[in-house]
């Protein structure tokens, strides 16, 4: 069979484009090197019947009506307010930092946003244009908050001192002066009712998917017109400009014969233990079963690529690959790995939908 599109990767970028192209009559072949669809969003029922996220928690949230409308074709939703705590000095504090965090941590009694703003103004360091992740936090919340909540967590998470990471790394986490303890501000926050894998199964219904397959081993054996590549861009070019670093995770799952292990879906451990956080995803999947599974995350440089490492040197390397990519006809690079960008799920989906619209022109 002759395919219009060979799509490399079965995560959200590949799935959206496979579904959209199939819907307009294009013949699509999806090739995935892993033994499952869904990329890092893949979830499954463990031996105890608990729905777990194999590659760490994926909390769905977005401000895009377009993304919600699109995904709602493939799933019903469980509305959520995702809430996270940080374990610091043997106490649990709301994350992101909010007025309650400030009151508890500094033993003060700030009652209004204005009082909290004034308090932070006295704590923060006067840095007009933060140049790195450390300066970003210091400019918003000051040294004490940085040292207690951000510094060691960032070092654990990235294996790099915050001074050597882009300000964007810590800018993702707001500092609030109100008492809002929701982890995200997005207007739509939910979990897919039957999990993420079910979404992908429906999205791939009209196209052929090959699992445990390296596209390089089959691309000369099949006929196709275009490639959509969602894998690591440096791998595509055989690392000719050097390897782009990705942070990965080793995740240890533990099952307990009780309804819940902890009171929150996620507790971060900035300063204690080698793991960064304990996640009990059952809090947000709303399963009603008498046991639970938690995951402990240990950041590492080995394993599946999770997070591009944002700093100026890596950006320079990526730009070299990006220029190479622009020279190739009928090969399209899209997604977190192909674009070497830290993208949330909704951003990946929106980018793929917009890319499809461009392709139709």
How should each PLM-predicted stretch be described?
Residues 22-47:
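Glycine-rich FAD pyrophosphate-binding loop
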Residues 3, 25, 207, 223-225, ...:
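Short, well-ordered alpha-helix to beta-strand connector turns
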Residues 69-70, 145, 262-264:
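Structural/interface elements that position substrates and couple domains in central-metabolism enzymes
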Residues 89-226, 230, 235-237:
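Active-site/ligand-binding neighborhood in enzyme catalytic cores
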Residues 48-123:
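Dinucleotide-binding Rossmann-like beta1-alpha1 core, especially the glycine-rich loop
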Residues 9, 81, 209-214, 335:
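Short loop/edge segments at beta-strand edges and connector loops
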Residues 3-30, 356:
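N-terminal Rossmann-like FAD-binding beta1-loop-alpha1 element of flavoenzymes
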């Amino acid at each position: 069979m002759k395919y219009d599109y060979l799509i490399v990767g079965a995560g959200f970028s590949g799935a959206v484009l496979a579904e959209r192209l199939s819907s307009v009559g294009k013949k699509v072949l999806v090739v995935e090197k892993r033994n499952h669809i869904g990329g890092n969003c893949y979830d499954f029922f463990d031996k105890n019947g608990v729905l777990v996220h194999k590659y760490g928690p994926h909390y769905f949230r977005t401000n895009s009506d377009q993304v919600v409308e699109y995904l709602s074709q493939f799933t019903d939703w469980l509305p959520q307010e995702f809430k996270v705590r940080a374990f610091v000095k043997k106490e649990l504090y709301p994350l992101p930092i909010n007025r309650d965090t400030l009151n508890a941590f500094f033993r003060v009694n700030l009652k209004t946003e204005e009082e909290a703003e004034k308090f932070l103004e006295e704590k923060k360091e006067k840095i007009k244009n933060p140049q790195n992740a450390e300066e970003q936090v210091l400019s918003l919340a000051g040294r004490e908050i940085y040292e207690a909540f951000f510094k060691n967590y960032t070092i654990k998470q990235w294996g790099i001192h915050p001074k050597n990471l882009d300000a964007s790394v810590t800018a993702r986490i707001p500092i609030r002066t109100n008492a809002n303890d929701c982890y995200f501000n997005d207007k739509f926050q939910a979990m897919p009712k039957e999990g993420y894998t079910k979404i992908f199964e429906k999205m791939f219904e009209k196209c052929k998917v090959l699992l445990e397959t390296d596209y390089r081993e089959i691309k000369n054996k099949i006929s196709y017109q275009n490639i959509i590549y969602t894998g690591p861009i440096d791998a595509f070019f055989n690392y000719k400009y050097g390897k782009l670093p990705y942070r990965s995770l080793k995740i240890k799952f533990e099952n307990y014969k009780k309804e819940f292990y902890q009171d929150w879906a996620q507790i971060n451990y900035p300063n204690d233990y080698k793991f960064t956080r304990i996640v009990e995803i059952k809090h947000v999947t709303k399963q009603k079963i008498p046991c639970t599974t938690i995951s402990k995350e240990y950041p590492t440089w080995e394993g599946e690529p999770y997070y591009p490492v944002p700093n100026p040197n890596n950006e320079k390397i990526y730009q070299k690959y990006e220029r190479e990519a622009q020279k190739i006809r009928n090969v399209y690079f899209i997604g977190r790995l192909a674009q070497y960008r830290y993208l949330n799920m909704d951003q990946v989906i929106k980018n793929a939908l917009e890319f499809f619209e461009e392709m139709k022109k």
